[in-house]
Amino acid sequence: APPLEAVPPIAYGGTERIVSELVHELDRRGHHVTTFASGDSRIPGRHVVTVPEALRPAGLADDPSAAFEETVRMVLERADEFDLIHSHIERWNLELARRTGVPVVSTFHGRLDVPWAAHAFAEAPRGLVAVSEDQARVHPEASWTVIHHGLTFDLPPMVGHPGDAFCFIGRITPEKGILDAVEVARTAPRLRFSRA
């Protein structure tokens, strides 16, 4: 897992939430899971501590490159213990996959239209996972499998009948298209705006 947030995350941390769900379900199904994550993570199975505490809440996330590189080093050091490595550490996924003989599934949760990725996927290893078709389209030269993020069934129930309100709960960033959605929503009759 990325060293930025605990697994599961305390507040923000979509990638870490997905890692937590995967670890819990694999453990429930009887798999032996080793998770490389921050020391404040609370997960079943073996836990290898990559940093004492998650970097973002500790105010140490300005340049986390060294922590990601240390995570890669730690995984490579123990790689022969694993049948499969499922990596969620963004651009460092590629380095990890290239440097081990163990099969690696590399899930990318973030944007891929960024400078580091411009040529990174030209000769990318196999096992690349994008979380949306749109994300995969950014680098068509790579061989992607698209697996959308899922939700657990223990979330609050969905409203059984439609209403006239819409609620977005999440981190607002430009790539999520919130401003576009607001502009479209303004044309809808009877739509009320509220903010928390």
What does each model-identified segment do?
Residues A1-A196:
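Catalytic cores of nucleotide-sugar-dependent glycosyltransferases that transfer UDP/GDP/TDP-activated
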